[in-house]
């Protein structure tokens, strides 16, 4: 699996976000929030950033899919003022997101990216 803006790029972005959530500390929601802030800043601070661009929207969308996968597959137990987060393993994340990438949707415009809210997308 390789190639810029292909389903391999979708896999990479999504897995990157899931792994950040798995490995950063904090509550489940703070992990997701931190991953979103960090990866969105990464995407939007580049010199080639275009808020309406196909590539930018693809990357931000696939980042979100990785965070959503983590949200559905991690659990948090609260004990009085303490909490415990149980995250999936790196291997579980990689396998699940690989399966999502194999079914990635080819998109030719931003509206088609947005209409595939639960699927990984690629533009090449």
What is the predicted role of each segment?
Residues 1-124:
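Intrinsically disordered, low-complexity, mixed-charge
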């Amino acid at each position: 699996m390789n190639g810029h803006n292909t389903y391999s790029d979708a896999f990479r972005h999504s897995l990157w976000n899931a792994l950040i959530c798995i490995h950063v500390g904090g509550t489940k929601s703070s992990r997701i929030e931190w991953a979103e802030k960090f990866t969105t800043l990464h995407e939007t601070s580049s010199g080639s950033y275009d808020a309406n661009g196909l590539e930018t929207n693809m990357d931000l969308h696939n980042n979100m899919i990785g965070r959503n996968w983590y949200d559905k597959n991690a659990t948090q137990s609260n004990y009085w003022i303490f909490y415990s987060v149980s995250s999936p393993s790196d291997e579980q994340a990689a396998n699940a997101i690989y399966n999502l990438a194999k079914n990635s949707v080819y998109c030719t415009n931003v509206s088609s990216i947005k209409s595939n809210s639960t699927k990984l997308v690629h533009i090449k």
